[in-house]
Amino acid sequence: MNEQSQAKSPEALRAMVAGTLANFQHPTLKHNLTTLKALHHVAWMDDTLHVELVMPFVWHSAFEELKEQCSAELLRITGAKAIDWKLSHNIATLKRVKNQPGINGVKNIIAVSSGKGGVGKSSTAVNLALALAAEGAKVGILDADIYGPSIPTMLGAENQRPTSPDGTHMAPIMSHGLATNSIGYLVTDDNAMVWRGPMASKALMQMLQETLWPDLDYLVLDMPPGTGDIQLTLAQNIPVTGAVVVTTPQDIALIDAKKGIVMFEKVEVPVLGIVENMSVHICSNCGHHEPIFGTGGAEKLAEKYHTQLLGQMPLHISLREDLDKGTPTVISRPESEFTAIYRQLADRVAAQLYWQGEVIPGEISFRAV
């Protein structure tokens, strides 16, 4: 230990670290890390400063930014030769809509919705789920689009069929680390679903409740597009923690996105924010960026309804190709700029879920990443 650090008590060392962390600002932080009581442990050993944070929501991408911004200052003020950073998560179970009881094994349900089809809702839901997992969470996804299930194909699992270990419940299909279920696993592409609304809603509720979900921090619910009776019934009856609305910058999509926000407000489901998909087209030949569907629409919509613009996802041919192959971009191109955007989105969704929610005491699990 050098002379500079010998002069510091453990309390003084912790105070220096806490003071530095308090100055770190990030879109995922409503309050600073010190106020959040995220600083779990500070220690000194062999000229190395050990810093451990515990966060109540997934935060890996933001954690990398923290290390980049704060390491030099901590080395300077402590005299350490190196810093050993560690991040752990205490993912809390948050209050569900209308205090409904939860689904066994599932802490939080995030509904991904769109007011109309064709805006990339399912592709966003899949990559969001995979990004949450990449950030350190245990994640599942339920394909709630009874009439047009696409999740099995996007995950390369369309030929798999769920099993029933007890003759009553279904075991989820595991794909790319996600626990999944979909009506698409039970019917073939040639068999169109002709169920009426109540039957479709009942089928989905059965899938949700009778799937043997493993312990999940987040279950992403890929809602059917639209704002009709089925969507309203699902929003009312599923113990959702929060909802994400997907749109494009196009005016017609924004009109329908407004309806989706209003629907969730009516049934008291917190809207976490808006994801603007296809915000800009990136040419695969020259890399030129062009906002073919317009600009600024989602941002104005978020401002009008006092919610967040959680992310803006580009339109690029590789995103579509990856889904067609059953290996979404977050899995197939982990170092790509698109995966970085999805992981930032995951951090913001998880953070917004926490800040808008209310922790249910006693339902927290610990896991280091």
Curated annotation (Swiss-Prot):
Alphabetical list of PANTHER family matching this protein: IRON-SULFUR PROTEIN NUBPL
Entry's Gene Ontology cellular component terms: cytosol
SUPFAM superfamilies according to UniProt: Fe-S cluster assembly (FSCA) domain-like, P-loop containing nucleoside triphosphate hydrolases
Domain of life: Bacteria
Protein name per its UniProtKB record: Iron-sulfur cluster carrier protein
Binding site for ATP: 115-122
Keyword Transferase found: no
Similarity comment: Belongs to the Mrp/NBP35 ATP-binding proteins family.
Species: Escherichia coli (strain K12)
HAMAP family documented for this protein: Mrp_NBP35
CDD domains with a match to the protein in the record: Mrp_NBP35
Organism lineage string: Bacteria, Pseudomonadati, Pseudomonadota, Gammaproteobacteria, Enterobacterales
An annotated Gene Ontology molecular function: metal ion binding
Function: Binds and transfers iron-sulfur (Fe-S) clusters to target apoproteins. Can hydrolyze ATP.
Keyword Iron-sulfur: yes
Gene name of the record: mrp
Alphabetic keyword roster: ATP-binding, Hydrolase, Iron, Iron-sulfur, Metal-binding, Nucleotide-binding
Oligomer status and interactors: Homodimer.
Gene Ontology biological process: iron-sulfur cluster assembly
